[in-house]
Amino acid sequence: MKTYLLEIEALCRAFEHVKENHGSAGVDQVTISQFESCYDENLYVLFCELNENRYRPLPLLKILVDKGNGEARALCIPAVRDRVVQTAVLQIISPILEREFEDCSFGYRRGRSVKQAVQRVREYYERGFTWVIDADIDAFFDRVDHTLLLQKVRQYITDEKILGLIELWLKAEIWDGKTITTLETGIPQGSPISPILANLFLDELDEAFQNMGCCFVRYADDYIVLCKSPEEAQKARQLSHEILDKLHLELDEEDVVSFDHGFKYLGVIFVRSMTLVPYDRKKRERKVLYYPPPLDMEAYRRRQAACGRCGCGRPDKPREG
């Protein structure tokens, strides 16, 4: 009996999730509504490409958005068709990987939030953990080592087709409006699969602090370690550097502070028993600072065909006439 990597039903469920999340068009300029107008055909094309090993993702569309602090963040947006496939794979691997994640991890996880992370910090303070290492990993999403990440994925995911897809997405092409480049390191922010891969990569850090007996709270690449003395904080600091060195990462900022002096984490100010939320801390819609001009998709597909690469999909827009 033939088994399929992803059944049509799985792709249907994935599309509904993509549709609920809204989102803009990718490099092919196909919107969610345009994809849906050829729904059956588009999903069937994806189904065939995936199960005949012809699927190839389109380049990611690199845009720049305002972080709200005067800096810009690059987001790499997959085409709708690729978001569907990534979401379908995510729905397969998420239950497997979520079982492995630690309780100290709050970012990008269903049923977990910034509010819960803040509450956890308060609980540790009330238990006497008043010294804090406040750390932020330098350019985490840009510096993730693909070889190390794939090794970690293989510890839990054994399906070679799924592993192959994840590797394809990690080594994605990126269109920035001028050239197409290939991602050599890092996890592209903006892809459905990226958050769970980020948590998997940093799970080793979570485990190390859990085993040390420290109180540890991590939200994505931003974490704090809570200790009962400055001496304990120094030991935790050393462990932090050792683990990040193994992961080929470095800290951007790192401070040992106390609740008496106060510190800021996840946009919240902690001072002694007080938790202060700045007045202007509101969820703002991220302003797009740069949106690249369209990529010539016909020329791109011709180049792909000439190189022997197939599976970039048929046109997803409604046919005229």
Question: Whereabouts are the PLM-identified features?
Answer:
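Conserved phosphate-binding loops in nucleotide/dinucleotide-binding enzymes
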Residues: R73-A79
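Residues immediately flanking
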Residues: Q91, A135-I137, S229, V268, ...
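Electropositive, glycine- and tryptophan-enriched low-complexity nucleic-acid-binding patches
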Residues: Q86-F106
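Intein modules and their embedded homing endonuclease domains
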Residues: C38-E41, V45-C48
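Duplex nucleic acid-engaging cores and interfaces of nucleic-acid transaction enzymes
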Residues: R81, V85
